[in-house]
Amino acid sequence: MADLVRQSKMLHTDATKMPYLDESAAKRTLSGQMWVYYGDRDHPFNVFDVCRDHSASGIDAFLKDKNFHGYLNADALNVYDHLFRSGTMTEVGCWAHCRRKFYEAKESDPARSHLALSRIRLLYQVEEEAKQIIAAQELTGSEVDEVRRQLRQEKALPILSDFQKWLLEEEPKVLPKSPMAQAIAYALRHWQALTRYRDDGFLDIDNNLAEMTLRHIAIGRKNWLFAGSQAGGDTAAILFSVTSTCHRHRVDAFAYLHDLLQRLAHDPQPAPELLRSWLPDRWQPPPTESADSG
């Protein structure tokens, strides 16, 4: 799945804390990270990967060292900057993250916050309109991309132009270190990445897909607290990859794993194409006994 997800034109990615026990010191935990790579519709897999620390080494090993070329939809963290500078990956900004900045400025600057949030709301209304058209016409593939591109060009582009003008006008008027100043600076600093989606219907307006996929890890962490070792973290990443991808395809993860383990027991080294057919997006459950007897 990792090799296939790296063939995506666009990847969503995000990370969350993944504490694990330090095997050299009893009762001490080290702070790692669990990354998720959410593949596009042609490579529909959710792949998790553990990094031992909070550096760029994990994402480098998964993407850069494996020669991923494409769009990367992510929060604007410094850990990604060198990937975008390399020219092999193109940043797609996250409007949900940008919106959060203006929402956090609501208490100290309610008037400007309301204006900014209302403009961002209009951008999401364009996306919702596209969804309704796509659903009503039962469009798929490139037809979806074209509807989204046309609607964004027609309706989102003027909203974005108006918003950018407002940001530039308000920037010198706000207190330099205020939450609103930080929100405006964030939007302007990442404007090119934030507006990249308007020209390509294949791209998404935000990184919510990755964030929602990681939410299960954050919730589960309250119960299991940490991984028992580095190897335990790696095993967890594999299991999360399988079960999350099953969930994406509405496949019963327990039934899938039960069947997969039986198949692997009979054929420990399946041919690549056979193994590909066993992945959750193509997997077919075995016939039931009642079906066999019928």
Q: Where in this protein do the model-derived segments appear?
A:
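Catalytic center-proximal scaffold of phosphoryl-transfer enzymes
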Residues: 1-294
